[in-house]
Regions:
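Cofactor-binding active-site loop characterized by glycine-rich and histidine/acidic residues
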Residues: 9, 20-23, 36-112
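N-terminal capping segment at the start of a domain
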Residues: 13-29
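Histidine-centered divalent metal-coordination motifs
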Residues: 31, 113
Length: 114
């Protein structure tokens, strides 16, 4: 990985953290520590290693992101929005009734598998 790629990933991780904290703050509910702690890993997966396609989210050969730390899902939601899988404004609906984005990963969002 080049220095430029490393800097770009650090910037993505910072953006994930900002968006996760913003989502949790707006929802007035959640655990920011979990999302903050997985931001570097999530950024590396979604923006460097994983083969995914927002134009074809059910692509058979796509990589899967396994998140076993449920409280950290705001970081994953932010990554999905930043990659173009969900509209950015959907992040403002975290934990609201009827939202596909809940405090733990749930199948209301078609990209989440449990």
């Amino acid at each position: 990985m080049t220095t430029q790629e490393m800097i770009a990933l650090k910037n993505k991780a910072t953006e994930l953290r900002i968006r996760a904290v913003d989502m949790i703050h707006k929802s007035k509910s959640g655990h920011p520590g979990g999302a903050l702690s997985v931001a570097d890993f999530t950024a590396a997966c979604y923006f460097h290693f994983m083969k995914v396609d927002p134009e074809n989210p059910r692509w058979e050969d796509r990589d899967r992101f396994v998140l076993s730390k449920g409280h950290a899902c705001p970081a994953q939601y932010a990554a999905l929005a930043m990659k173009g899988f969900i509209p950015m404004e959907t992040l403002d609906t975290l934990r609201k009734e009827g939202s596909p984005l809940q405090g733990h990963p749930c199948m209301n969002l078609s990209l989440i598998h449990i």
